[in-house]
UniProtKB/Swiss-Prot annotation:
Keywords: Cytoplasm, Methylation, Phosphoprotein. Signal peptide: none annotated. It comes from Pongo abelii (Sumatran orangutan). It is found in: Cytoplasm, Myofibril, Sarcomere, Z line. The modification Omega-N-methylarginine is found at residue 53. The modification Phosphothreonine is found at residues 107, 111. One of its GO terms (molecular function) is FATZ binding. Residues 106-120 have a biased composition (Pro residues). Residues 90-135 are annotated as: Disordered. InterPro entries: MYOZ. Belongs to the myozenin family. GO terms for cellular component: actin cytoskeleton; Z disc. This is Myozenin-2.
Amino acid sequence: MLSHNTMVKQRKQQATAIMKEVHGNDVDGMDLGKKVSIPRDIMLEELSHLSNRGARLFKMRQRRSDKYTFENFQYQSRAQINHSIAMQNGKVDGSNLEGGSQQAPLTPPNTPDPRSPPNPDNIAPGYSGPLKEIPPEKFNTTAVPKYYQSPWEQAISNDPELLEALYPKLFKPEGKAELPDYRSFNRVATPFGGFEKASRMVKFKVPDFELLLLTDPRFMSFVNPLSGRRSFNRTPKGWISENIPIVITTEPTDDTTVPESEDL
């Protein structure tokens, strides 16, 4: 039985190998720390097992992305092999390439030279223009498509009632019938004095009213109706009841003049 530490080391090694396969050798140059690297390694390890649906979907998506990413990988590898063979043959024959000459980049076949002006024949061979040979009247004619008629429709085509039942139509509004002319015995309110007096125009006299001025006290009473109300607020009172005013005398208490007696 393997110990826990060895199992953890093996898992880390598997995760690092998977990371190298996916991202290349750039993983060693960046240390993201334990908080980022360990959960990422565990996640990639779980995705590599194909034991759950998420891992299978991840692999399917990875294959689909690789299909478009590495589409020209075989062509590039073949071009590199051909270029290396040509270089070896040139060295053997003594035809060395000049140092100042620049080689054009590898491009797929049937690709126009970007340095030359664009030619319509090179861009789209066989295209002579916007339908010059076909007259413009051909585009204005509208072709009526042939519709399909089922055997059921063919069988009932001779019977109009069945056709109407097959294709229901909206109901048309029926015409209104003329109402009979009945005599009305409803009672009508008769005006006082008969219809002859009621036909005269009734004159209405506007009653006279007096306009008050703004300085009129009656108008002021209307503006502030609380001004004439009786006040029931309690007023402060002294020690003497019934609101009798207190009269304070200012007579001096010490009399300087001494009255004379009868003996003197």
